[in-house]
């Protein structure tokens, strides 16, 4: 088969006559930045031939496109097909090869590429969000496709791990003469591109670097969130010990940040705070205003897990029925969503699985902040959000913190530094800012 080593297409924004752009991409890493909701995933679907007949804000005419295409999806769970890590690594190889010796050799090489130790019989669902993203990247490149399209699929990774994975990607595309098109909501990712573009609702244009904006700063008043961890140990069965005799004390926090490398135990610590999991030994206790049992709500890094296939409308009605949401705040909650470009009437009766991830995440944050909980725990709240959307979320949560308390679990150190007054670091990837109280974990 004749190899096409160029991706050439014209994008035409139909509601803006004359606003079209021709894009020519040759082997290398190319980055398109865009805020959530501008059409990044729609562009992926157009390029891969999976776009439906529903209207969008642009049309695409593809003039040249490689034959062998691999897509890496935004939600890492959507790409995992096997019930073991070994099976996941071998799946693509077995679909594309018949030589068992070659499959075994490549499989072992892929296993070596994982930057974390694994038990091959472990279920992929037990990996952290970032570890799943790494797994999907490795399997996507395993069959040496000519074009790899990455749909905001590195947003769970901290800076150090993201740089490490991108260097591995650069090595592969140089060796195999591949085109990698990476669509991202993180403006910092533009630094990695051989060509850099910005997608908006009205245009796709080459990105012009400028001075990076900064988050608006607001000093938080002292809070009453206290966390005591005393000689706590915990591990998942047959896996490495995440916490070994860990000790930590947090006093009078208004907003507590939990940061750390991918797989360091951030989400697991949240499950221990919530009582979903329990320490193997030692103790962990959270108090608020002297209350040993504050009411808490947790928004998972995979937000659809909060309601499953149910709808946001039903969730609101449940909160109303149990008294967690007051009737007079119901309308205000919907108004706040509308201000954040969330069209309530369009999503209210949709299954959570049919709502774009970032939209679902923001909608759930708005709902939970209008309910009567003493403490919110937000796991990766900025995932998939562009710079302006992060600023809007920051300012919204800063207003919420005048009365309430939150715990923010995130790899997004810059966001954590600006929304939290105390930060617990689960590894040595330290935060350096004079305005924060930083607490390092202490394990024996």
Give the predicted meaning of each segment.
Residues 141, 368-369:
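ABC ATPase C-loop
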Residues 33-35, 259-261:
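The feature captures the beta-strand-to-loop junction immediately N-terminal to the Walker
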Residues 123-127, 131, 351-355:
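Conserved ABC ATPase signature
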